[in-house]
Amino acid sequence: MLDVILVIIGYLIGSISSAIVVCRAMNLGDPRQGGSGNPGATNVLRLAGKVPAGITLLGDWLKGTLPVLLAWLATEDPVVASAAGLAAFFGHLFPVYFRFQGGKGVATGLGVILAWSPLALLATVVTWLAVAGAFRYSSLAAVVAFAMAPIYMLWLSASPVLTAATAILTAAIVWRHRENIVRLAAGEESRIGSSGS
């Protein structure tokens, strides 16, 4: 029963949209109605600048990390920790509080990976930074970094359970970025720092 409660808590925490909460609190409007329409830190950066985007990023990151840490502390079971992390992640993608219309999951996914394996998180972030720095596309950096994340998890945690859970994150993030991938292929994707959608 505790396992189920931890998973439900993870989903409910993940369903809190940091972008919407931050933008409402700062009277910045609804991020779903401007820019790319995605309620995430990158779109908040485009619409409102670095400070609101930074707060959004931190909120999205923490809501991935905290449910996993709670599950580790309560059970010390990697299966429960994996389930709680995935619940938080899918809560971000499909939030019950916002008609199941959520973000793309990058920051929350990174927060989950942090709690699963800090070393795998470090490798994933370094990959994101390298790709983003070289090409200036946030979406490309996210797809490449998460494509590598299961490999990093297997290498650095040696946990088949956590590796499988990371692969699920990867598949979902690639799917959520499918429109970005089409725009990248067409040369129409907005670069980091641009004001486009």
UniProtKB/Swiss-Prot annotation:
Keyword field: Cell inner membrane, Cell membrane, Lipid biosynthesis, Lipid metabolism, Membrane, Phospholipid biosynthesis, Phospholipid metabolism, Transferase, Transmembrane, Transmembrane helix
Subcellular location field: Cell inner membrane
Organism: Halorhodospira halophila (strain DSM 244 / SL1)
EC code: 2.3.1.275
Name this protein carries in UniProt: Glycerol-3-phosphate acyltransferase
Membrane topology: Multi-pass membrane protein
GO CC terms of this entry: plasma membrane
Pathway: Lipid metabolism; phospholipid metabolism
PANTHER family tied to this protein: GLYCEROL-3-PHOSPHATE ACYLTRANSFERASE-RELATED, INNER MEMBRANE PROTEIN YGIH
Xref: Pfam families: G3P_acyltransf (PF02660)
Subunit structure: Probably interacts with PlsX.
Superkingdom of origin: Bacteria
Family: Belongs to the PlsY family.
Function: Catalyzes the transfer of an acyl group from acyl-phosphate (acyl-PO(4)) to glycerol-3-phosphate (G3P) to form lysophosphatidic acid (LPA). This enzyme utilizes acyl-phosphate as fatty acyl donor, but not acyl-CoA or acyl-ACP.
HAMAP family with a match to the protein in the record: PlsY
Catalytic activity: an acyl phosphate + sn-glycerol 3-phosphate = a 1-acyl-sn-glycero-3-phosphate + phosphate
Keyword Transmembrane helix set for record: yes
Transmembrane segments: 2-22, 53-73, 78-98, 112-132, 152-174
GO BP field: phospholipid biosynthetic process
GO MF term list: acyl-phosphate glycerol-3-phosphate acyltransferase activity
